[in-house]
């Protein structure tokens, strides 16, 4: 072997493999270093690929020092941008007819190679240069180098791996081969059709020579492996194709192809499609030969039997390819095969389109646009090529191997128009010609500044957020009911069942408040303003289980209400019977359930006032009093929570006053003692029931805190925590006698300054009233027989009893009855005025229910006096 001999090693599928590698890296988001964003979505790509295919991106990215810039494009449709990126990585793309104009406009703005007018003009100029070169050198040898291929009968030099082919090249001193002045007719017709589709020239012979010379310049090193290596020239897994017939004995070579297409063919070629992919590609060989000798497939899964017409039996001289570099001819024209359904390109088949279109979370976004009808059309129509490249009659650039949109919910496209406006605020148009400005890694082409936006991480979530907002707006009434339902814990304990309070013969039904036996949950539920528990919900429940639970709770409420009605009726019948004291005390009637209805500061201190609607004897009054104690004891036993137990205990302590017991005992023989004294029926009525309530009210029992669970062993006061109990004992009971003590409220202070401040704030204007009501005749407790208020109320009771006695006797003088009535009315007016004029007593009375008791006392007294002397009592009551 001569020392001057060299060997050329060729990777047959080099271009397709490189483009496939770039696409695989993009699919895996490996080494991506730029993000294109528009309409709130983003696509990740490689800067080197974008720069190689677009001068616009090359200039923009060259001036950007950022490691991973984000380019925001305004007035660019995301579907067009996605199709452009697919075109850059594949070399071809399918575009819907409705989107073709906007796609070409976007490609022209971004100056994508192969799709712009400037690119077509450059291609025409290069072809003209090639034509002139071919005309000048077509009859002479183009190069002194020769390319020798072994005869088919002498075996193959192709290696077993199929990745390279061995060629021998002689030195410059070897004799030149004979010139080849012409080409076979079938290759000439093939190339003539290509040239005619590009520039529609009538010079067929010149086009043949030009295209053939162009092929020789770029493809002189291409060769076809011999028949001995069957199917070894391809590195893909394309489906099996019919074997070819025997080839000619002379060396064969394929015409070169210059497309920069990426084909999914290196290990995962899917089944071929039925449609021809004439796009911006040629025959798909990527300038590297067919890749097999007898073969299964070429570089992109195209059958070799369809390409027999493009093979030449004669050897070609090597051209000066190093001196001439042309733009790819097949970027703008097709091979125009007669059989339009035999050429297949597997780079955008259904499976891969499905993978790419569903990779919205992978950084490239999903193939979707604001026009839903574009997706629904199926993308089945053919598309015309731009007029500046070729006419629609000659070729259709974008055939309808449709994009696949698997499982795209139309609701996912909600809010897209709002995203257009949002993304429009982030960037300016790239048509301004500026290379862009860098703001924290965000490039805003054509503008001086913009808002930094993490488009690569945040923009993909806008559709789902807008959709969720709309769904929440539509279902807000239903969710409101569901929140109100789930905010309150449900339980089956009887203490939480709603009840309707009854007082006497009337019912106190409230539509805004639930009555739930004084629990925290009932208070929180009533504060929410939910509808009455007795009625059904107007809004449908979310699940069947919820309906079932509601029905069960409704049945429980009905049964509870029935039981309460029976108890209340039995209780009223027991009260009407004068001697019915032998039966055990029933459970508490429904009127006790209004502990939970009223606020804690307005708990009424009279719970047996309905007994006054009946005619009470001494035994009946005593029975009512005993029944009240039994009811309280039963309620304490049934109290389910510490709060309920505490308030029931507080209520029982308020009801057990010594003045009530004394007045009940003093009125025991009132009706049997005859007329003329306080022991008569009127005195029995007022002293046994009303005086008890007045005495309870005058004790000024303020409501206890909710969490009071620690009792002082000295004064019996309930405190919330051990620390407050300790401080209470230290300040109230363990201080020395000479410390500062308030003489009005008996509160102990640590310093005299604190005592003076306390008096100036709380007792400056209330001293006289406080001492008048609460400190009389050496007795300091309000409600005791020595206090002024108790004396006034006692005189009121005595006057009322005397008036009632005079009316019942009937033989007394009218003047005496009138005088007693006037005296009773005056006493009532004075007592009420004194009570209301005192700030401390008045406020405490309102807080503890005293005002209600006083007004009821005055109303009962007015009704009684109007029966005896209505003309005299009415002016006094008007004064009140």
Curated annotation (Swiss-Prot):
Residue ranges of domain BTB in the record: 32-97
Inducing factors: Induced as a primary response to 20-hydroxyecdysone in third instar larval imaginal disks.
Tell me which UniProt keywords the record has, alphabetically: Developmental protein, DNA-binding, Metal-binding, Nucleus, Repeat, Zinc, Zinc-finger
- Where is the protein found, in the record's own terms? Nucleus
Q: Where is the composition biased (Low complexity)?
A: 227-238, 453-466, 473-491, 655-666
Which cellular component appears as one GO term in the record?
polytene chromosome
Q: Which InterPro entries does this chain map to?
A: BTB/POZ_dom, Dros_DevTransReg, SKP1/BTB/POZ_sf, Znf_C2H2_sf, Znf_C2H2_type
Glycoprotein listed as a keyword? no
Query: Which SMART domains does its entry note?
Result: BTB, ZnF_C2H2
Q: Name one GO biological process term.
A: follicle cell of egg chamber development
First and last residues of each zinc finger (C2H2-type): 710-733, 740-763
Q: Which Gene3D superfamilies match?
A: Classic Zinc Finger (3.30.160.60), Potassium Channel Kv1.1, Chain A (3.30.710.10)
Task: Name a GO molecular-function annotation.
Answer: zinc ion binding
Task: Return the Polar residues bias intervals.
Answer: 135-149
CDD domains attached to this UniProt entry: BTB_POZ_BAB-like
- Function, as annotated: Broad-complex proteins are required for puffing and transcription of salivary gland late genes during metamorphosis.
Protein known as:
Broad-complex core protein isoform 6
| Organism expressing this protein natively | Drosophila melanogaster (Fruit fly)
